[in-house]
Amino acid sequence: MKDPLLKKGSFLSITLLILSGELIFLLPYVLPRVFRPTFLEVFNLNNLQLGSLFSVYGTMALLSYVYGGVISDRFQPKKLIAVSLFFTALGGVVLAGYPSYFILKILYGYWGFTTVFLFWGAMIKATRVWGGSKNQGKAFAFLDGGRGLVAASMGSLGVLIFSAFLTHDIESANLIERKEAFRYVILFSSFMVFLTGFLVLFFMEKDQKDELKKTNSLNSYSNIKTVLKIQSVWLIMIIIISAYMGYKVTDIYSLYASEVMLFDHIQTANIGSLQLYLRPLVCVIIALIADKTSYIYFIIIGFITM
């Protein structure tokens, strides 16, 4: 069988996977990460309330992860990914209206469903097929490294949009002016998510029939039970959870820059976006090396570094 890496148009497919893989999280995660002080101010939130929103998101996402994998076994990834992007973008329209805290909790629960249930399993499966049997490390390196580049680029672009629509200097701009400028950032982000969904739906290649077969849903549920009995699966879970705990710590960099270093909102947003540029560089370099050596070694080094 011909390796999917070598098939015509595979570069377009991985590019769309990279775009969708990061833009799907742009509204619920990247904007609060890059614009943390601004996000708290314009939505009149404190850190506990924002953390509660993420908890609502995480709870819904956890349930979606469990059942979403079954859905990805039965439908073409491109359709699942596109639908997820469309519904996620609609949530951005609600966010741009500056809803109440109660509505924000509903919105984050909604995003926990739209960004994971139909999306995550489909993206992982499509990436695995793209990489073939001998290039899994490269495939996921390009995916995660590319996602990091997209996040950094969108963060920087968001900062430019925010500063461009401020009618006064950031220090003299009042809350209403900041909210209006940030609204454009939200709407632009929503448009980019929707546009990516359109591109995925019409331009991403279909997976080969013999590589992605539709499976009976009952068999899929049975497979979940079987997989959970494998010890290495639980070790992988621990690795992923621990890695994300370390990753989430970096979310407060922009808030630290604002409250401790006394940077203004534009400068703190720049701090939040600039840190994202390290992600693509490290991901690609490590994964290219990991394909030729033991990946366990790099996991150990990573945790020691953190």
Predicted feature descriptions by range:
Residues 201-222:
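Flexible cytoplasmic inter-helical loops of multi-pass small-molecule transporters
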Residues 64-76, 281-295:
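Helix-to-loop junctions at the C-terminal end of transmembrane segments
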Residues 180-202:
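Symmetry-related core transmembrane helices of the 12-TM Major Facilitator Superfamily/SLC fold
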Residues 86-100, 304-306:
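C-terminal ends and interior cores of transmembrane alpha-helices
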Residues 74-85, 291-303:
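Cytoplasmic membrane-interface "Motif A"-like loop-to-helix N-cap segments
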Residues 108-146:
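Cytoplasmic helix-loop-helix junction between adjacent transmembrane helices
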Residues 32-36, 147, 151-159, 231-273:
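Extracytoplasmic gate region of multi-pass secondary transporters
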